[in-house]
């Protein structure tokens, strides 16, 4: 463990994020933010609507009178814009691609990232998905420096997050953001006061890379031999992926979402993985019972 000592008056921070979150609001309320960059790589209809209407980062920047830049793809040159703002530290949360070295190495104090897992576990783009997949109930957040690798930089600090059985994705995400906001603020304060830890990560991760999951791969990932409790928990955490199985029409899938309801431990003769309906509603036949689901109108707060 090493301690790096810097003394910076009025630390200037630049934020890179694609989420209007507790993390963003905490930084805006407590630190000197000199710029916000919003990377927007996802071109799906629901994502565009969500970002443009429900989670408009540009409007937040305008409210706080902070310079804003939309980063439309990973090839866009953002270094000149960053140079003009001259931040001491860049803070990243929810970034769809890796930053170039010329960017993350520009600030005098470097660039830190908030990752929703206890590194070196679940390095990659979607750690929360894989937390559900591996039925991992003990997770957390990591604030780490960005280097050339994917989530491999030195760790500043970590905080634990407990996953409740059957907790939905958006509920767990809210937990991550609450604890993550505390963690990122603590990390910045430590860096600002010259008391930040830099803990080297192990080269190898105990888990496979937390890759993005496409429709076809999600279907392949479902292990119908899992017991009912595990598959129900997995479905509750991946409702947005389940719609690719349960809603065949692509346009309809943009309007509706899936909400997983209760599970029922019961014997049956249905084919495992098949869809049915009884007096209690629609259900998926699983090993050892049924998992009920409903169609709900799309809601960006439950995405």
For every predicted segment, state its role.
Residues 247-261:
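Short, structured protein-protein interaction patches enriched in aromatics and acidic/basic residues
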Residues 235, 239, 259-264:
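Short leucine-rich amphipathic alpha-helical surface patches
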